[in-house]
Amino acid sequence: MRFQQRRNYSSHTDAELARAFRVLAHPLRISALRAFAVSDEPLAAGDVAFMERDEIPAPTVRHHLQLLAEAGLLRAVGPRSRGAPGRPAHRYVLTDLGTDVLELLHTAAATSTPRRSARSV
């Protein structure tokens, strides 16, 4: 099967794409990136829906969001006042790289067919 490029991803270097895909090796980070893709507003760790559903502690979610930001998939837009003492919650938005990587993942998933292992033939 030949890959048909629908968008121009040349604005991203191979190193940027490799770093982005490497950080997405954790399923929680893919879930987080998807949450940002459907949000119209910046999100903080406590805003990410799977955190409550899966009972993932906020510090763990913050760590994963920070890794996504370091890989260039998210961009911090500043702290949000929580109205309570303590560390302010950082809010993030999806970057162009994050959007493009999600589109590449979606395209790959939509066009891939399950492979049978050589042992099952």
What are the functions of these language-model segments?
Residues 39-40, 52-55, 68, 81, ...:
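The DNA-recognition helices of helix-turn-helix-type DNA-binding domains
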Residues 62-69:
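Short, hydrophobic-biased segments on the C-terminal half of alpha helices
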Residues 1-16, 34-39, 86, 93-121:
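Amphipathic alpha-helical dimerization/coiled-coil segments
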Residues 16-56:
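N-terminal helix-turn-helix DNA-binding core of bacterial DNA-binding proteins
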Residues 69-87:
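Beta-hairpin "wing" of winged helix-turn-helix
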Residues 59:
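Key DNA-contact positions within bacterial/archaeal DNA-binding proteins
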Residues 63, 76, 89, 107-108:
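Short, glycine/charged-enriched secondary-structure capping and boundary segments
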